[in-house]
Amino acid sequence: GVMLQIGTRNTQNFELLKIVGRSREFPVLLKRGFGITLEESLNAAEYLASEGNARIVFGLRGMKTNMGDPHRNFVDFAHVPVVKRLTRMPVCIDPSHSVGTRERAPDGLLDVMHVTAQGIVAGANMVLVDFHPHPAKALVDGPQALTLPELPWFLEDVAIARAAYESRRLLAEREARKTARIAQPHAGD
């Protein structure tokens, strides 16, 4: 299928938002705005929806700040459940643009894999990661691209993170049922 993408630098391009909002044929991936608040980015999504296209996926791709060093951006994946709670929109995480490099952590995992797991465990619905057969030859985003031979490893790691999320979700459901039983008055009281 086809999905339109509005990148971070166009999140406040209101003429573009109007045009894309009026075209209901394709869903839209709207990335969080560059240098604006979460609320301002969510308002851009609302602007799109008000023009008629409510098939919006909200993209988190990190925030530009010096607190992100040594990564390109400060990872904002703690906002995954916040966006879902406030809007009910599906959420896409973009670990490649958040991290911006292929650095490997001391445990052997790539930073982008750690960040991907964070977003998935937080409940992300979609992941956008850069892959390239020869990252050094890529015209854009080469330094952050994973290689094609790394794809099976990446997908297995994603499956592990997803299983952890599902376990956590089931635990929350069980606790909610337990709390509901405790809150119900007993017959004959």
Role assignments for model-derived ranges:
Residues 155-189:
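Surface-exposed amphipathic alpha-helical tracts and adjacent flexible/coil segments at the periphery
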Residues 1-17:
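Active-site beta->alpha loop and helix N-cap motifs at the rims of alpha/beta catalytic domains
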Residues 66-68, 101-103, 133-142, 171-182:
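Flexible glycine/acidic-rich beta-alpha junction loops that bind and position SAM and/or redox cofactors
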